[in-house]
């Protein structure tokens, strides 16, 4: 399937000079959404994934569907202050500033095979932080799946050593 044709580009959103990739057009197409999940699942199914995780918020869309398809658990990676129990957190750099991600400290177990999923790979900061957070709890990230990769931003380089697939490159 031509996934790229299912994604709308909105120029100058959310600010001038940004070319936003709107995934809602793919998500509302049941066949395209199904095909995206099946394509990702086919790549990682042989690895025996135990757990799928993704960062808030759009990462949840693909990560939870993929976890269901792989018969694996799903762990949400949250923004600070959203989880009710003891957490492990990690800070990471943004272009202008810093952000944090959190997860319950009992979310992952040593030896679990984890797949990290997000909608978009740009600079790789969020996904790198997610990998580091998961692995700080003893689990092993065995792959990364994204719908869209903005290739010119070089995010894949920050994920070296991991099996990374993207269904669409811009």
From Swiss-Prot:
Which Gene Ontology terms describe the biological processes this protein takes part in? adenine salvage; AMP salvage; purine ribonucleoside salvage
Does the UniProt entry include the keyword Cell membrane? no
Pathways involved: Purine metabolism; AMP biosynthesis via salvage pathway; AMP from adenine: step 1/1
Fetch the InterPro entries from UniProt.
Answer: Ade_phspho_trans, PRibTrfase_dom, PRTase-like, UPRTase/APRTase
**Where can this protein be found?**
Cytoplasm
The subunit structure is: Homodimer.
Q: What is this protein called?
A: Adenine phosphoribosyltransferase
Q: Organism, per UniProt? A: Symbiobacterium thermophilum (strain DSM 24528 / JCM 14929 / IAM 14863 / T)
Q: What is the gene called? A: apt
